[in-house]
């Protein structure tokens, strides 16, 4: 009788439904292994066992079987950058509700364009030349994302200037390169704008420049054909 009782208890212990140890979900496993990693979303990808993690600024991936994290671009067989597409969708939702009160407004055209730029960025200056001839057609809402100390100083010069639009033209046009004298005031309003742009960039998840938001779509980089197509719609 005692042997039968022991056998029954062993069977009950081995049955999946009776086990006291429940198998963790991939997300629970991730939380346990990478407890310091803060994230907004944890979603499945087209690859079995690989999950997309978005931390508000960057997409990375979790391989549940190996319990490892990795960063990179996921490319489909037809050449689509699935990582870039997913990131653009997330940025789009944030940009759709973005307040532009602190953006530098340039132009007076019907089409509104939000742009994140660094004043020394080569492609940002190419986009400046492109939009500079279209000021009657578009209104730019400029948000700065400095990638160097010199860029930050040039942004401060713009914010410290009485005519910010002209200062923007001078800086992006290259007139203040070659160690030109900059207006680096300690004005609180300028400092507040510097902080506001920094906070907005962090909220949206900006990590490189330029980036544009045109007619509900995100355009990473100065993709002139894509921009021209959107403007023509």
What are these regions, as identified by a protein language model?
Residues 163-181:
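Catalytic cores of secreted/periplasmic lytic hydrolases that degrade extracellular macromolecules
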Residues 158-162:
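Mechanochemical coupling/switch segment within NTP-driven translocation systems
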Residues 9-14:
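Hydrophobic core
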Residues 5-7, 18-156, 170, 181-209, ...:
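Extracytoplasmic thiol/disulfide redox context detector
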């Amino acid at each position: 009788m005692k042997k039968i009782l022991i056998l029954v208890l062993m069977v009950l212990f081995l049955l999946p439904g009776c086990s006291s140890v429940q198998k963790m979900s991939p997300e629970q496993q991730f939380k346990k292994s990478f407890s310091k990693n803060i994230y907004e979303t944890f979603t499945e990808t087209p690859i079995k066992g690989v999950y997309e993690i978005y931390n508000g600024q960057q997409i990375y991936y979790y391989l549940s079987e190996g319990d490892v994290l990795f960063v990179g671009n996921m490319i489909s067989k037809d050449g689509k950058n699935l990582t870039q597409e997913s990131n653009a969708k997330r940025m789009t939702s944030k940009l759709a509700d973005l307040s532009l009160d602190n953006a530098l407004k340039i132009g007076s055209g019907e089409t509104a364009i939000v742009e994140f730029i660094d004043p020394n960025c080569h492609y940002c200056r190419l986009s400046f030349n492109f939009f500079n001839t279209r000021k009657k057609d578009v209104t730019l809402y400029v948000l700065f994302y400095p990638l160097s100390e010199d860029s930050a100083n040039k942004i401060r010069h713009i914010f410290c200037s009485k005519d910010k639009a002209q200062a923007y033209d001078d800086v992006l046009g290259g007139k203040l390169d070659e160690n030109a004298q900059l207006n680096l005031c300690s004005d609180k309003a300028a400092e507040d704008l510097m902080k506001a742009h920094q906070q907005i960039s962090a909220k949206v998840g900006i990590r490189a420049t330029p980036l544009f938001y045109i007619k509900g779509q995100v355009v990473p980089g100065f993709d002139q054909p894509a921009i021209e197509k959107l403007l023509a719609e």
